[in-house]
Amino acid sequence: MAIAREPRLRGQRSDAARNREALVRAATAAVHREGPHVSLATIAADAGVGIGTLYRHFRTREDLLGFLAHRSFEQVLVNVQAAESEGATGGDALRRFIEAAIAQRNELVLPLHGGPPVAAPETLAVRDQVHRAVQRIIERGRTDGTISQDATPRDIVAFGAMLSQPRRPDPEWDATCHRLLATYLNGLCRTDSRVGPTRSRAVAADDHAPLDSHTSPGPLQEGECRTHPG
């Protein structure tokens, strides 16, 4: 009897996996469209399943949003690790990292993309791995001369989030994003004689702030040049 039931069980598992993936895709699009307080019934309807199916996969709204954030940070981690290993220079790795975020912007639900703040320890751990990888890329760029400005991981993450917001209807937006990226990277590689080798206390302190926080960096200090985009 167990052998006879096996094909049916495989089919049920396959259906469950398809439903879950449909829910994840629908939830991602709905959060981008309406924000994190979008109706769960709307998400279920968009996925083509009943609300009961949604609750079988995600018991609460927080579970669903937390899964979307964790999944997004894991993808960003894959991107930054690939950029770090494939980039010929620090600057090239940085370009690859942000270009990947732009290409995947409709798949990411993160705090700087309109998602809720992250609290789950396992998700924070993945986020911290991303930040450390970005720091390594920056240090590599300073060593090879392709990143000469006093950029911080916070700057890079914030700028990447700006360019990788969910798709806009303007057909020229992709080209605009890549022009802005090129301009930003050119600025990072430009030596400014006003900035000495010693980093200011304001910038050093800013490094330790959560990179997905919604707070603004402190005011510029006299003689300080920061590459933060706004």
Language-model-detected regions and their locations in the chain:
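Helix-turn-helix/winged-helix DNA-binding modules
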Residues: 35-36, 56, 148
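Short linear capping/connector segments at secondary-structure termini
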Residues: 111-121, 201
